[in-house]
Amino acid sequence: MSKGTVALAMSGGVDSSVSAYILKERGYDVIGIYMDLWRDEREEYCNKSAAEDARRVAEKLDIPFHVINIEKKFKDNVIDYFIDEYLSGRTPNPCVACNRTIKFEAFFNAAKEFGADFMATGHYCKIEERNGRKVIVKAEDDKKDQTYMMYNLKQYQLERTIMPCGEYKKDYIREIAENIGLDVYNKKDSQEICFIPDNDHGGFIKRNYKSKVSEGNFVDKKGNIIGKHKGIIYYTIGQRKGLGIALGKPAYVIDINPITNEVVIGDEEDIFRTELIARDVNFIPFDKLEKSMELEAKVRYSAKPSKATIIPLENNKVKVVFQNKQRAITKGQSVVFYDKDMLVGGGIIEEIV
């Protein structure tokens, strides 16, 4: 007897491909869906290749396969946001934006239109029930854990979402793929932003919005001009390489001012801070933070969680006070909170205090 119908987001990669197999083995009826998100002349072949990989896997596993076009929604909510953030002197997190608006909104709604009871992805996270609520827990494979990008999810989404890969190590996922004859078993993991395969975000922005990128001044902490920069989109807090200025000592980006089009340069000690304000905060184990909590938090995907106090503010904001100084806290990035293995929530870094 079927456990229900699952619409699986298939990317053509090994994780979503093996997810299809696992779900079938568990007794679900699986529908494979590839999302056509973005293309230009440089990326079109890559998109076709990924879609064909997904289609071949679906045929091999004998599951229905569909391609849906979400280009406009992706452009409006991810591409435009990505570019606007860089032009505003912030460093965006497109994967967080994509999860919130595309994978767990647009795809979630598409799954319902296909008559699915659940949706599934190849993300490395676990969904459990604790104290009567669905929560997100760190993946079995700590090196592949993707909970940092999931803090925006709501209860209604978690109740209908399955993430099979979260329960396994990545090596085992590849082993399954090879054993069942999937030719994507050795396909490389994507390391870059999906719509910028060459990882040159500055070039991408300049190709699409050339008129908005202009040179400006490097200034020191006192406002003295110390050089010329090629456009604020090319810089982020804590950056040392590629500045193109020689000061006789290591120089770091410590602030970006989009109004004056200036990049502020300082010393390494200037990029270590302990406090920030985050906006658009979402919590998963509860609806609202009523009082301060002692948790762990991290300010980038690759960082280790560090002890911090999370203090509720008005307008869906929080203040985060770390016990130890954090390197290069960056406006536009996400700060994410944990209680041991459980994802508690997160928000967008708005201000560094």
From Swiss-Prot:
Top-tier EC class: transferase
Keyword tRNA-binding: yes
Catalytic activities: S-sulfanyl-L-cysteinyl-[protein] + uridine(34) in tRNA + AH2 + ATP = 2-thiouridine(34) in tRNA + L-cysteinyl-[protein] + A + AMP + diphosphate + H(+)
One Gene Ontology cellular component annotation held by this UniProt entry: cytoplasm
Record: residues binding ATP: A9, M10, S11, G12, G13, V14, D15, S16, M35, G122
Site (Interaction with tRNA): residue numbering on this chain: H123, Q333
GO MF annotations in UniProt: ATP binding; tRNA binding; tRNA-uridine 2-sulfurtransferase activity
Transmembrane segments: none
EC number assigned by the record: 2.8.1.13
InterPro entries in the record: MnmA-like, MnmA-like_C, MnmA-like_central, MnmA-like_central_sf, Rossmann-like_a/b/a_fold
Subcellular localization(s) per the UniProt record: Cytoplasm
Statement: the UniProt record of this protein carries the keyword ATP-binding: yes
Disulfide-bond pairs as recorded: C98-C194
Region (Interaction with tRNA): 144-146, 300-301
HAMAP family for the chain: tRNA_thiouridyl_MnmA (MF_00144)
Protein name, UniProt field: tRNA-specific 2-thiouridylase MnmA 1
Organism the protein comes from: Clostridium botulinum (strain Okra / Type B1)
